Amino acid sequence: MTNNQWVLARTPLGGFPHEDDFRWQTGALPEIEPGQLLTKTIYLSLDPYQWGRRRSGVEVPGDVCHGRTVSQVVSSRREGFEEGDFVFNTNGWQSFGLTGEGISHFGYMYPRKLDAKAASISTAIGVMGMLGLTAYSGLLVQCQPQPGETVIISAASGGVGQVACQLAKIAGCRVIGIAGNAQKLKFLSDVVGVDHCVSHLSEDFEDELRTLCPDGCDVYFENVGGKVYEAVLPLLNKNSRITVCGMIS
């Protein structure tokens, strides 16, 4: 079997990723050592924090690009794991990877066995993983939204944003999602189930948002920054709460 990999070709210059930042390569499967698992990547999570790793030099040219994964055990020399088990690990952008003792290129992480009968294995890098925990902690733990309050969530169609929207609805709040294009707005309305959504690309964005908040905003889940934050700030009520999760703009 061949291991297909995306590696960092150069330290990014800034702004948006460019195809010249990455290089495709193939090679042999790595040799497995005691205490390790050889796993096949099934799902890969692409997250905004990865871009920061590359721009800051945590990843250097030649490194396999970082990424959390759901994988299946191909070969095991680690107690408690067998061939065929599904695990949450950090294979990165490659078809196969080693997990376990002595693996440090992504920072050591214990492989976690997944129960495919309890939930879809893909949820380990979604609602039951880092994305879900971020939304849960940022919204419910930090902001403690109350029934009837107005909650605004930026980048609402993203991985963290869509979970935060649903948690706010479960809490009995009136939820306004901010996103970009029409496809994302339709997703928020038809699938996520927000009460209202508005595009930050609209020329009348600030006026539209203000109209949707006649009684102000009680909770703001910040993922964007920039002009979106500036539009929400005047709408915040006394004793309102803000979670700053990211500044992707």
Predicted regions and their residues:
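Short SAM/SAH-binding signature in class I
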Residues: 215-221, 240-241
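Short amphipathic alpha-helix with an adjacent loop that forms part of the alpha/beta core around
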Residues: 204-215
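Short glycine-centered segments of the SAM/dcSAM-binding site in methyltransferase folds
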Residues: 86, 150, 174, 240-242
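Glycine-rich phosphate-binding loop and adjacent beta-alpha segment
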Residues: 188, 227-249
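Mid-domain Rossmann-like dinucleotide-binding core that forms the NAD(H)/NADP(H) cofactor-binding site
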Residues: 125-203
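NAD(P)H dinucleotide-binding glycine-rich loop of Rossmann-like/cofactor-binding domains
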Residues: 65-72, 83-155, 197
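Glycine-rich beta-strand-centered segment in the early N-terminal region that forms part
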Residues: 28-46, 52-93
